[in-house]
């Protein structure tokens, strides 16, 4: 997998998309074989990523969701976030379960999940709108250097429509 990325990105070698694709296909086959024996959450997450993006295999969000759900149930925070996000974005899973997976990942400190959940509460998507909770989540995410969350905080504090206007906080974020 790492060799495929090196060929794809031209790191330590000349960029060669054909070689990269061949190595990604080998990696996918290897991960698939290993996962069948081990049921390792990291392999399941990686297989889900590869299926979601079509890297080394055909793009298949249904299969990606399957692997992510297996990994999520084993406690893989990245899979919890990826599964919840996929279900919310393409409308294929139970929206309440999607929010529950993102919440679980956010509570485990995943900055991307905190940002995504902040948007869910800001916009009232499948949950009651709660700006206080949204700001709390955006802040947790921004404190982990998530630039998107920092931008949202800056916008919210500058506008002062849903939270008290605070120009200093807007500038800080």
Spans of model-derived segments:
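Hydrophobic face of amphipathic alpha-helices that form TPR/SEL1-like repeat modules
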Residues: 2-9, 30, 44-53, 57, ...
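Short helix-capping/linker turns of helical repeat alpha-solenoids
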Residues: 9-11, 16, 30-33, 37-40, ...
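Glutamine-centric residue-chemistry signal
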Residues: 19, 25, 44, 74, ...
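TPR/TPR-like (Sel1-like) alpha-helical repeat modules
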Residues: 18-29, 168-173
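Hydrophobic/aromatic packing residues within the alpha-helices of TPR/SEL1-like helical repeat arrays
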Residues: 24, 31-32, 68, 102, ...
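Repeat-mediated protein-protein interaction surfaces in helical alpha-solenoids
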Residues: 28-36, 98, 134
